[in-house]
A protein has these predicted regions:
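Structural signal for alpha-helical transmembrane segments and their membrane-water exit/capping regions
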Residues: 1-13, 41, 112-115, 119, ...
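Helix-loop-helix "hairpin" substructures at the membrane interface of multi-pass membrane proteins
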Residues: 67-74, 81-85, 138-214
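Transmembrane alpha-helical segments in multi-pass inner-membrane proteins
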Residues: 200, 210-253
Length: 253
């Protein structure tokens, strides 16, 4: 398909144009990147979209008072809601399909309440002063793409070089066997959901900066593509195989 479009319109294959298009899918990729950790353990995170929506509202409203520290608030909020999903899933034995759907409903309600059920807008000057670098370019490379590569590198390090990554792989391959070997499965599963929530929050922050505002439904339509990016990349819903590099390939596809 790319070859056909490129033949019809040679300008389509210009490096600058391809990089620009890659930059546009960064929020989707970041959301899918976080979801990979949950799918990796055989779960699913249906709250990511609503989480991103909430963060666009929070970032827009509190940018004026918190400045750059609003980013920390957004990530902490995403981590907390993800932790809540993981806690309900592991400690209360609620299937992740239901627990994350409930957390997504909570995030949506919070976004509706904070925004007054309407779209909110950032002050353009303040946005450019605090987060303008996020939507700028380094040469012909969009800075969002650089952020995505950095996050991919961190996720890859966690997956392949840390105890957390190795345990998540073991849990996905066989939860009962992992528990029998003495691993605190619940603790690590909660962390997987917390990571997913944190990255959904970063995706929401990028959304807010790119669009200079937020709304309770601004990221609607991204949940299914994020899940598909994970699955197409080769991380099945049963977990245990695949990984974040696969998700990067799946997102590009």
């Amino acid at each position: 398909l790319v070859a056909i479009v490129g033949a019809a319109n040679p300008g389509f294959l210009r490096p600058a144009n391809l990089l620009e298009m890659a930059g546009d899918i960064v929020p989707l990729f970041v959301m899918a990147l976080g979801m990979t950790f949950v799918v990796y353990i055989g779960g699913i995170d249906l709250s990511a979209q609503s989480m991103a929506n909430l963060i666009t509202v929070v970032a827009t409203i509190y940018l004026a008072t918190l400045g750059p520290f609003v980013a920390l608030l957004c990530i902490a909020l995403g981590f907390g809601l993800g932790y809540l999903s993981g806690f309900v899933t592991t400690r209360l034995l609620v299937p992740s399909f239901i627990s994350t759907l409930a957390t997504g409903g909570l995030a949506f309600s919070m976004a509706q309440w904070l925004s007054g059920q309407r779209a909110v807008t950032m002050d353009a000057d303040q946005r450019n002063r605090v987060f303008g670098w996020m939507i700028g370019k380094t040469g012909i490379v969009p800075n969002e793409l650089i952020i995505a590569v950095v996050l991919l590198g961190i996720a890859l390090f966690i997956e392949r070089r840390t105890t957390l990554g190795r345990v998540l792989k073991a849990v996905g391959a066989g939860e009962l066997a992992a528990a029998a070997s003495g691993i605190n499965v619940a603790r690590f599963k909660i962390l997987a959901f917390a990571i997913s929530g944190s990255l959904a929050a970063i995706a929401g922050l990028i959304f807010a900066v790119k669009l200079s505002g937020g709304a309770p439904t601004i990221a609607n339509g991204f949940l299914l593509p994020a899940i598909v990016a994970v699955l197409v990349g080769g991380t099945p819903l049963t977990g245990g195989v695949g990984g974040v590099l696969n998700t990067a390939i799946g997102t590009l596809i």
